A protein has these predicted regions:
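Non-catalytic, conformational "gating/processing" segments within enzyme and secreted inhibitor domains
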Residues: 151, 204-236, 435
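Short pre-active-site segment immediately N-terminal to the catalytic Zn-binding motif
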Residues: 64-72
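A common structural junction motif
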Residues: 134-142, 236-244, 315, 354-365
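Bacterial N-terminal signal peptides
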Residues: 7-18
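Non-catalytic beta-strand/loop surface segments
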Residues: 20-58, 63-65, 90-125, 161-215, ...
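Positively charged n-region of N-terminal signal peptides that target proteins for export
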Residues: 1-4
Length: 465
């Protein structure tokens, strides 16, 4: 639930007043799910919801950009694109016809740890989409033509979605330099050079290694008959063999930080200078993740948040200021970022950011601040659970990334149980000077003449098709 829930919170409009002031009494609807595992290793999770005649289908593959081969960054994302090409019995782009032509939708996204494909269709098309997902798992056409066409698409996406934005290089640098050992430092979207160096044989090997039933979780939420679903899953998925190849997992551990590091990043077309801090934090499974998420919400959710009030409204030294937790399967980052107002300097912004983080360590947050953050979270999750897609992705993330599908039901109560003392404790533990990397993002014109070329590009946050 971590990333999906937090992205919803970021977009939510805070409901003020006393709408959810009794959060302790607010009961989130529980997801009553069924779970089974086929002999070939495919995990199947399902939730019946007959509130509308629709169904959401998700396939979660436990492979992401951290699994890209060395010097082949971008493979997981590239393969997300190739999965929409032809199969033995489907023409290219047929997934669009099977969904959009009946009033549904489909898409996919790649993150550091997973690649996810999903469809939402009228429930009488469930069997068709199950067949289609089994078809592209078992008999995808990976040939030179499909490989080259999708590589070109991804390279153009790289240019348009990352190189073009004025702050793209900053976000790339945050991951690239904040991680020193773990492959999280590689961009999800890859690099032009690595994609150019790739061959179709490389792609086929990647597919054979990771796209297999024992590395997939099928999630179905909506209007269906459970017995009929089981029969269709057996018919289309149970016949797919489990390969004899070993399933590799990343074993690299990111070392602890022992001293503050500083980075000066330069890029063309920088409209506002930036100052960012990253702090290394543990896996999203760690018990401290709840308090870290609440700390980020208190720092930057809404115009009454601490960072906005201090840096943007009162001191007027920043055009924007934010904090976020990027929690992942192996390790994460707590990131604080501000863009400097015209006429102000990065040094004073850095000083003020540090002061606000120190306040979290020095004293517990107020009851009112904590209540506001809780209200935002409840509001967002209630909205999320209104849709089949929202429920299916929450359940899928709990199963694949948190290791327990029931975390979809227990995570929210855990988050709401965070206390001011918990927030103060994790602030002292993780938001300390020795665990901080500092980044300045400056115009290329300010680079010392002995410097190197512009920094790379960003592709984090989940690449979509």
């Amino acid at each position: 639930m971590r990333r999906i829930l937090l992205s919803l919170i970021a977009a939510a409009v805070f409901i003020g007043g006393s709408a959810f002031m009794g959060h302790a009494q607010t009961k989130m609807p529980q997801m009553v799910f069924r779970e089974r595992t086929l002999k070939n290793g495919l995990r199947v999770l399902s939730v019946v919801d007959k509130s509308s005649p629709t169904v959401a289908i998700n396939v979660w593959y436990h492979v992401g950009s951290k699994d890209d081969p060395d010097h082949r960054s971008g493979f997981a994302h590239l393969f997300e694109h190739i999965m929409f090409k032809s199969t033995k019995d489907m023409k290219a782009e047929m997934m669009d016809r099977l969904t959009e032509d009946v009033g549904g939708e489909n898409n996919a996204f790649t993150q550091d740890d997973v690649t996810v494909y999903y469809e939402v269709v009228p429930s009488n098309y469930l069997e068709t989409l199950l067949w289609a997902e089994a078809e592209r798992l078992s008999s995808l056409t990976v040939d030179e033509a499909n490989f080259k066409s999708e590589r070109a698409v991804v390279q153009e996406e790289y240019r348009q979605s990352v190189l073009a934005p004025p702050n793209g290089r900053l976000f790339y640098a945050l991951d690239q330099k904040s991680f020193v050992a773990h492959p999280y430092k590689r961009p999800t979207i890859g690099s032009i050079e690595d994609l150019d160096a790739a061959t179709v044989d490389d792609v086929i090997k990647f597919h054979n290694t990771y796209y297999r039933p024992d590395n997939a979780t099928l999630v179905i939420v909506g209007d269906f008959d459970p017995k009929q679903l089981d029969a269709w899953v057996d018919k289309y998925f149970a016949v797919i063999p489990k390969p004899n190849l070993a399933l590799p997992r990343v074993q690299v551990k990111e070392p602890e930080r022992t001293a503050e590091k500083r980075f000066m990043e330069y890029a063309p077309n920088v409209p506002l200078k930036g100052v960012a801090f990253t702090y290394l934090v543990p896996s999203e499974k760690n018990e401290d993740s709840d308090a870290l998420e609440m700390a980020a919400a208190i720092l930057s959710r809404g115009r009454s948040s601490r960072l906005y009030q201090s840096l943007v409204y009162q001191q007027q030294i920043a055009a924007s200021a934010s904090a976020r937790t990027d929690l992942r399967e192996d390790a994460g980052l707590f990131t604080v970022l501000a863009f400097v107002s015209n006429g102000k300097n990065p040094e004073e912004v850095e000083k003020s950011l540090k002061a606000e983080l120190q306040k979290l360590q020095d004293a517990p947050v107020s009851a009112a601040e904590l209540e506001k953050a809780r209200n935002q979270i409840i509001t967002s999750e209630l909205r999320n659970r209104e849709t089949d897609l929202g429920k299916s992705q929450t359940l899928g993330e709990a199963a694949v990334l948190l290791g327990d599908p029931n975390r979809a039901n227990t995570d929210l109560p855990r988050l709401l149980a965070v206390t001011p003392a918990d927030i103060q404790r994790v602030a002292k533990k993780y938001l300390k000077d020795t665990n901080r990397d500092v980044f300045y993002y400056l115009p290329e014109s300010e680079r010392p003449k002995t410097g190197t070329g512009p920094v790379g590009i960003n592709a984090k946050g989940g690449q979509g098709r």
